Amino acid sequence: MNILKSLISVGIMTLISRIFGFFRDVLIAHIFGASMFTDAFFIAFKIPNLLRRIFAEGAFYQSFIPILIDYKSRKDKEYIQEFIRSTCGFTILVLTTFVILGIIFSDYIIFISAPGFSESSKKLQLASNLLKIMFPYILFISLSSLCSSILNSYNYFFIPSLSSSLLNISIIVFSFFFSDYFEPSIISLAWSVMIGGFFQLFYQFPHLYKIKMLVFPKINFKNIGLIKVLKKMGPSTLGSCANQISLIFNTIFSSLLHSGSISWIYYADRLIEFPIGIIGVSLSTILFTSFSCSYSNNTQSEYKILLNWGIRFGLILSLPISVILFMFSKPLVIILFQYGKFTDFDVLMTQKALELYSFGLVSFILVKILVSAFYSCQEVNIPMRISILTLFLTQLMNPFLIFYFQHSGLALSCSIASWINFFLLYWKLYQKGIINFKLNDFIFIFRLLIAVLVMTFFLIFMLYFIPSWKIGSFFDKIIRLFTILSISGIVYLIALHFLGIRLLNYSDKLFQKK
């Protein structure tokens, strides 16, 4: 498998999905602004999203793929199909029960997730109604993730990465054409989420059929593969839950702050998730499969090479982007969100949160790579323990940081906790002898920092000649921003070249060793 080719393919599709996602958020900001209605929607939407990250993209994904890849190399097709049938049947049974309970107890879930909503019965009831509509999304997206995991295991990365765009397209279509048919109109977004999840699932069926892995679900708790997945899912779920519980606590804190805080954090989070999705998710998705193959084939040298390549490539891409996000936080918020009911005050509040999120971007991305390295060799306890520790530290920091920074203190605590998470994971890999920090690694980081510094000085110089970002049409601003960032990217690449970091040669070395 050509890792760089797969990475580019997934990265491009993720970029397209994120562009749709930004267009979606621009529409929401334009139509609804930062109001009681958006706060209610974002809280309700966050709950199935948190569950998606735990069940679909977290514990299940990390436990299922290594076992499936191991079976691919040792078992016949019928054995693998039986494993998939049993896994699918178990997933449907558990999550259908979960969805029914979630709909029944939606009022209590909202009250626990956002206690600040209790001051407004209308806000609480609206969020509860939205949650009832969206709860089935967790079933659709979890089954979609199962399909994606199977396709990824067979080195089909393009199709699963495209499916994420379908949710954004659904929300865009409903915002444009159906919002006037609902009262209040924010309910249209809830229906768009559920329908988008439906299409994300069924879109992948023809591609599963092509590889003869489209099978009918079956309830079989005795399947050996399923039992292995469930055993691994215990610690994996705790690790995933720790991260998501931290987000729930952040939501609770933000619900107690100034009205609009939830929306400001959401919009800043959307901006920081853009590079995390394109770089972090793409890298970890591709590398996770490669790590699992290396572990299954017992080729530790290849495993170490892949991990070193992933960390270095992640640093090369994430460091300059973190600087750009910090320096261009205000222009990005203005260009993408300041329309309709989104005010100057909303821009300022979102900007503050984004600036503090940007400090953690590098660690957000590197943590995904390191966690993939652990899970691929079926080591789930270490990431779980570190996740629980960082959850505890984050919630210790939150009250103090909120006192000084209000809602943006939540962004800062996430960034600090992510760096702690990264260093602890790195240290554990170092103790295991998987990572060895050598002199050439120090030289690499030093050269990389110089290249980023050169780009930063160039950006500072360019900012002196840039007119106010409030001047010009949307497309004028986009062209202006794209031009500046493109030139800055070229400056960065030239600096890397002169400092001896040549991306093409660097990638070629990886494939030669593979």
Curated annotation (Swiss-Prot):
Compartments where found: Cell inner membrane
InterPro entries for the chain: Lipid_II_flippase_MurJ/MviN (IPR051050), MurJ (IPR004268)
GO cellular component terms listed in the entry, alphabetical order: plasma membrane
Gene (name only): murJ
Known pathway: Cell wall biogenesis; peptidoglycan biosynthesis
Protein family (similarity comment): Belongs to the MurJ/MviN family.
GO molecular function, one term: lipid-linked peptidoglycan transporter activity
Name of this protein: Probable lipid II flippase MurJ
